[in-house]
């Protein structure tokens, strides 16, 4: 009888210790687990509001993650100062909008990766990968300014239990020249944020040269790899072209013993979608042939080539818009959207541009995503 009581007390004590460890050691234990092993992600486009049906649409697609992107502002690519744009941004890019969106998503079982970007004003054709200071003093100033800016979002993510943070995106020159400064930034982030960290390296040259992957939880790639050189490629040609990229990605994953996230991946609904996937629709010729079928094939080849690779943690598809109105089906939404686009073009006195999108939500590619994102 005494032995039984002693054993019972011991079991109770052990249970309390284990429960205490769960509470203190991992403050994220109450989070909803993904339905599938992969990160079924979408790059969320912030707007002036969010409605419940916006999140329902994501759930219906089978997505389990969204990324949210607030911005910091530089006045030219050699400016050592970064401005927090919290009060001069779309509501969804402000702190309040980010927090509200993440909370609404979490109610439906959707996790969030916070992915702040730098926007360069007066860029003169330069972008984030071209950021370069003109002296050591200015480099120190830039990294100090960047650290202050990114720590703002690290604290916001921690305070609101946002599950992942992308510490930077496509800073090619800075990552090659100053990896130690990036390690310092990462160490400072770790002091205030306990979730997972990644960095979004550009597909061209950068992802293979970043040397601080071992300080992060995942390798992140902005995966706009060129696949073919011709319009309207076959799916077989697209799958074949993924071969060389798969080999380099797998090699990198094995080198650092880290899984890889495509922090962005997407294709436009054009015949040349697989030639230069990174090209913005606004930069295309107005006569660029539209091809929803090519976009759909690009996504089919992407999933068939990579989704079952053990080194792949998941995709964040560029990009997904909120809508102010709830429509019964896509055709109704598309009809209304085309009507509004014609009205806007008429008011501006300009011809309506072709309906070229990155987002698969407007095209047949949506069903490809749904098929793969809802498959166990």
Q: Predicted segments — roles?
A:
Residues 46-59, 143-156, 202-212, 296-305:
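Short, acidic/polar
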Residues 25-60:
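Boundary/entry segment of secreted carbohydrate-active catalytic domains
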Residues 45-59, 83-107, 145-148:
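Aromatic- and glycine-enriched glycan-recognition loops and surfaces
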């Amino acid at each position: 009888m005494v032995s039984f009581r002693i054993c019972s007390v011991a079991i109770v004590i052990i249970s309390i210790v284990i429960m205490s460890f769960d509470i203190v050691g991992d403050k994220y234990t109450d989070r909803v687990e993904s339905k599938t092993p992969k990160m079924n992600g979408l790059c969320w486009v912030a707007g002036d509001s969010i409605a419940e049906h916006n999140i329902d649409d994501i759930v219906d697609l089978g997505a389990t993650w969204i990324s949210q992107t607030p911005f910091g502002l530089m006045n030219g690519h050699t400016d050592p100062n970064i401005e927090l744009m919290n009060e001069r941004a779309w509501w969804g890019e402000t702190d309040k909008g980010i927090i509200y969106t993440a909370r609404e998503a979490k109610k439906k079982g959707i996790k969030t990766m916070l992915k702040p970007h730098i926007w360069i004003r007066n860029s003169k054709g330069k972008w984030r990968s071209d950021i370069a200071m003109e002296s050591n003093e200015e480099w120190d100033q830039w990294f100090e300014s960047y650290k202050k800016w990114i720590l703002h979002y690290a604290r916001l993510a921690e305070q609101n239990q946002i599950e992942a943070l992308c510490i930077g995106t496509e800073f090619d020159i800075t990552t090659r020249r100053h990896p130690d400064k990036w390690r310092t930034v990462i160490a400072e982030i770790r002091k205030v944020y306990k979730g997972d960290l990644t960095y979004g390296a550009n597909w061209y040259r950068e992802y293979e040269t970043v040397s601080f992957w071992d300080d992060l939880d995942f390798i992140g790639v902005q995966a706009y790899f060129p696949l073919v050189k011709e319009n309207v490629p076959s799916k077989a040609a697209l799958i074949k072209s993924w071969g060389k990229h798969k080999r380099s990605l797998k090699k990198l994953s094995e080198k650092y013993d880290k899984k890889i996230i495509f922090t962005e991946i997407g294709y436009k609904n054009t015949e040349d979608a697989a030639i230069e996937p990174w090209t913005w629709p606004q930069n295309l010729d107005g006569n660029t042939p539209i091809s929803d079928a090519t976009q759909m094939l690009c996504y089919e080849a992407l999933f068939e080539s990579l989704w079952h690779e053990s080194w792949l943690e998941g995709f964040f598809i560029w990009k997904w818009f909120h809508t102010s109105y709830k429509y019964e089906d896509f055709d109704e939404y598309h009809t209304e959207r085309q009507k509004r686009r014609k009205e806007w073009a008429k008011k501006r006195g300009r011809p309506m541009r072709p309906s070229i999108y990155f987002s698969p939500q407007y095209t047949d590619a949506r069903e490809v995503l749904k098929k793969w994102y809802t498959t166990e």
